[in-house]
Amino acid sequence: MAPKRKPPARAAAAKLDPDGMFRGVSAFVVPHAVQSRRLEVWKQRLAQMGGRVQEKLAAKGGGGAVTHVLAADAKALLRELDAAWLHRFRGSVVSFEWLEECLKSGERLPEHKFAINYEEEFKPKKEGGAAGSGVLQSAKRSKISSDGPENRKETAGGNRESRDAIAHPNEDSDVVKGPSTCTSSQSASGDSKETIASQNAFKAEEASSGESSTYAPPDLNRNITEIFGKLINIYRALGDDRRSFSYYKAIPVIEKLPFKIESADQVKDLPAIGKSLKDHINEIVNTGKLSKLEHFENDEKVRTVSLFGEVWGVGPATALKLYDKGHRTLDDLQKDDSLTSAQRIGLKFFDDIKQRIPRHEVSEMEKLLQEVGTDILPGVIIVCGGSYRRGKSSCGDMDIIITHPDGESHVGFLPKFVQRLKGINFLREDLIFSIHSIEGTDCGVDTYFGLCTYPGRELRHRIDLKVYPRNRHAFGLLAWTGNDVLNRRLRILADSKGYILDDTGLYLATPGSGGKRGGRSDAIINCDTEKDVFDTLGFPWLEPHERNL
């Protein structure tokens, strides 16, 4: 019997077209903010139609054989590649939308329409952006706040999940991994060489909470911003930080408009309002609702995971696990023995924590904190940051930034402060408590996260206390004031200038390989005030109430 002949390989051969529309394209594909399966399909299609996919970049810039860099957006791009390298790159830097549209149309489209303008990430805009929220990676790691951290959630031990911090779209993009390389909390900028005059100037500038400059936008389009706000929470709970952040950026832009939106054409040229959001606005204006939101609200899984994600300390991964266990309500969670003590506290006071705090009450509590702190340590500086310092009429929580001008007396202050505040029934439940100033670890920054009560009431509010050494205080104050958009722009700008910026300092970046970001040096750039940080980076100075970008 004659052996069977193998079928001709015509089908396989037909899939490869070296003269296809992507001939001459040698692409490096940034894998962030896109599903891996979708990414593989795009790579296959690109290769089938004459293109090539490069897995590595040349280390010295120029991209080697690479002609195109493809990414989801500027944020994903700058997570993978150094801004300085991109400036040297002479090829095309485009979004995946270019590839998608080429495949849809069957022809290679002009690339300039899909170019990623990563420089816009750190350029100031008159209108645009949004507040977001920052988070501690752990009780023993430094936080890079991305805004006024109003929505951060931590696990009891401080181990952060891929959680809902818009300020931290992805954990490896915003948190310095590995052991802390920070030096001791003592420095020349905070020791006895500092004059009384400079200490007084420091107090005058940094102690201002922005009380006299409130942020009161017209807010004539609540029908739109309230829907966008719900989508923020849903996408955050689902771990889709990219989409969550896009709605987050749009809200302040819409809030500031001096007119009622009656047509989507009125917003087509506004920053942070792309085609998708414009379509949403058009639907809301014409129908009074948004089908996407209704779809989410009618989906049991999305609805439940979103609900669980609102519990303090529960991130997207944990929320999904709880759903997969069969839990559907907050009452169900009460019976789950896998919850940490901090998560149980978040669950117990779920309704309390969700209530916003009126500005005048925050002001009174800030004064109380200053009085108690001064009684323990004369000269201590205590400022409430976040949306309060930016002038908002209410706050989701209180972010308290603390230091002492002499650069030394802050050491060991936080335990005494917490004990005194518990003694007067101001601080009630503990979530995270870590002390590093005594040993000089983790840049000497001490942290307390917990719940507090307004005097005479039992309603719980979230409060964070951060004590910084004098030489790191400006960075902490800047980071914990926010907002998210400003902090992201400053970090990207710092990166483009060869620095790494976080809430503990501005550091010289160490070189990486293949165009990728390296680590950071031990040395901190001296900046006594927030303005010094702005000036060092070459970014226009913004008063706290001007930072609602």
Curated annotation (Swiss-Prot):
EC number annotated for this UniProt entry: 2.7.7.7, 4.2.99.-
Stated role: Repair polymerase involved in base excision repair (BER) and responsible for repair of lesions that give rise to abasic (AP) sites in DNA. Has both DNA polymerase and terminal transferase activities. Has a 5'-deoxyribose-5-phosphate lyase (dRP lyase) activity.
List of residues binding dCTP: R356, S387, Y388, R389, R390, G396, D397, M398, D399, N487
Chief location of this protein within or outside the cell: nucleus
Protein name (Swiss-Prot/TrEMBL): DNA polymerase lambda
Region annotation (DNA-binding) ranges: 233-247, 315-318, 438-479
Pfam families for the chain: DNA_pol_B_palm, DNA_pol_B_thumb, DNA_pol_lambd_f, HHH_8
GO molecular function: 5'-deoxyribose-5-phosphate lyase activity; DNA binding; DNA-directed DNA polymerase activity; manganese ion binding
Chain spans, region Disordered: 126-197
Subunit-level organization: Interacts with PCNA.
Cofactor or coenzyme needed: Mn(2+)
Alphabetical keyword list: DNA damage, DNA repair, DNA replication, DNA synthesis, DNA-binding, DNA-directed DNA polymerase, Lyase, Manganese, Metal-binding, Nucleotidyltransferase, Nucleus, Transferase
Phenotype when changing D397A: Loss of polymerase activity
InterPro entries, A to Z: BRCT_dom (IPR001357), BRCT_dom_sf (IPR036420), DNA-dir_DNA_pol_X (IPR002054), DNA_pol-X_BS (IPR019843), DNA_pol_b-like_N (IPR010996), DNA_pol_B_palm_palm (IPR028207), DNA_pol_lambd_fingers_domain (IPR018944), DNA_pol_lamdba_lyase_dom_sf (IPR027421)
Example GO biological process: response to UV-B
Induction: By UV treatment and methyl methanesulfonate (MMS).
Keyword match Coiled coil: no
Disulfide pairings: none
Residues at which Mn(2+) binds: D397, D399, D464
Subcellular localization, as worded in the UniProt entry: Nucleus
Family: Belongs to the DNA polymerase type-X family.
Catalysed conversion reaction: DNA(n) + a 2'-deoxyribonucleoside 5'-triphosphate = DNA(n+1) + diphosphate
Region (Involved in primer binding): 390-399
Domain of life (superkingdom): Eukaryota
Gene Ontology terms: cellular component: nucleus
Listed Polar residues bias regions: 180-197
